[in-house]
Amino acid sequence: MTFKSGFVAILGRPNVGKSTFLNYVMGQKIAIMSDKAQTTRNKIMGIYTTEEEQIVFIDTPGIHKPKTALGDFMVESAYSTLREVDTVLFMVPADEKRGKGDDMIMERLKQAKVPVILVVNKIDKVHPDQLLEQIDDFRQQMDFKEIVPISATQGNNVNRLMEILKENLDEGFQYFPADQITDHPERFLVSEMIREKVLHLTREEIPHSVAVVIESMKRDEFTDKVHIRATIMVERDSQKGIIIGKQGAMLKKIGSMARRDIELMLGDKVFLETWVKVKKNWRDKKLDLADFGYNEKEY
């Protein structure tokens, strides 16, 4: 029996459901999710393996017009995947008309030397007539290998998309062990789970200004708990106040919710210590970006 494998990039504007799709396919949380745009900042691999094939999905940051050095990093990180994959999934939402952001991405995709599949997500939110209009509009913009409507939250038609991807795989190596599901270390996943709770619980001005640094992560041999010390970085004192909350209530809530997710992922009891620090304008300082895990070497 021949083994097939390939790399698949998931591209699109912010908030179209790329991470939701990846988590659904993997059957567990690999990429954090929130209703805030630009939640994903780093490229994240989801490694899907069966006895017959391995598909390495690369979830990318939402492509937008960058306003900071962090934004530049995110967009370049997304586009750089075009150089390293066999297929691109270009994801668009069924419930929003084609916009300038979509057109900008398609101009780059037209230059790509790999097949592009249009994935129209969130079909559960629209009438079939509206979906057909959306598909027709995009079909006129460029030549897609396939067009597949799905609902990543409900799983509608995701199996069909997976069948198409499997059909288009070439014979190849198994690049990763069968039990490995992502390329990122546990520390990265832990920091992302904490950041997800900050995004979920805080107001609009906070999300883009937050980074999470894991200062230490080790098992206590006496309690058999994993001790994690994490620092939440923000850009302004006012943001620090919001995250700490009245008498520390917000920070406690963030920690409690994050700890539950981390325990599920690690399969261990966790003692989580969280601190908040101000680092002014860190999103525009390359040294700070590298310190907080946003490194140009990634692309």
From Swiss-Prot:
Q: Is the Cytoplasm keyword given for this protein?
A: yes
Predominant place of localization: cytoplasm
Q: Which residues bind GTP?
A: 12-19, 59-63, 121-124
Pfam families tied to this protein = KH_2, MMR_HSR1
Q: Where is this region: G1?
A: 12-19
Q: Where is this region: G5?
A: 150-152
Region described as G3:
59-62
Q: Does the keyword Transferase apply?
A: no
- Show where the Era-type G domain sits: 4-171
Question: For the region G2, what residue ranges are annotated?
Answer: 38-42
GO CC annotations? cytosol; plasma membrane
Record's InterPro entries? Answer: G_ERA_dom, GTP-bd, GTPase_Era-like, KH_dom-like_a/b, KH_dom_type_2, KH_sf_prok-type, P-loop_NTPase, Small_GTP-bd
**What's one GO BP annotation on this UniProt entry?**
ribosomal small subunit assembly
Q: Where is this region: G4?
A: 121-124
Q: Where in the cell is it found?
A: Cytoplasm; Cell membrane
Membrane topology classification: Peripheral membrane protein
Q: Which residues form the KH type-2 domain?
A: 202-280
Which keywords does this chain's UniProt record carry? Answer: Cell membrane, Cytoplasm, GTP-binding, Membrane, Nucleotide-binding, Ribosome biogenesis, RNA-binding, rRNA-binding
One GO MF term: GTPase activity
Q: What does this protein do?
A: An essential GTPase that binds both GDP and GTP, with rapid nucleotide exchange. Plays a role in 16S rRNA processing and 30S ribosomal subunit biogenesis and possibly also in cell cycle regulation and energy metabolism.
The entry assigns this protein to a family as follows: Belongs to the TRAFAC class TrmE-Era-EngA-EngB-Septin-like GTPase superfamily. Era GTPase family.
Under PANTHER family, the record lists: GTPASE ERA, GTPASE ERA, MITOCHONDRIAL
Q: Which NCBIfam families match?
A: era, PRK00089.1, small_GTP
Q: What is this protein called?
A: GTPase Era
Question: Coding gene?
Answer: era
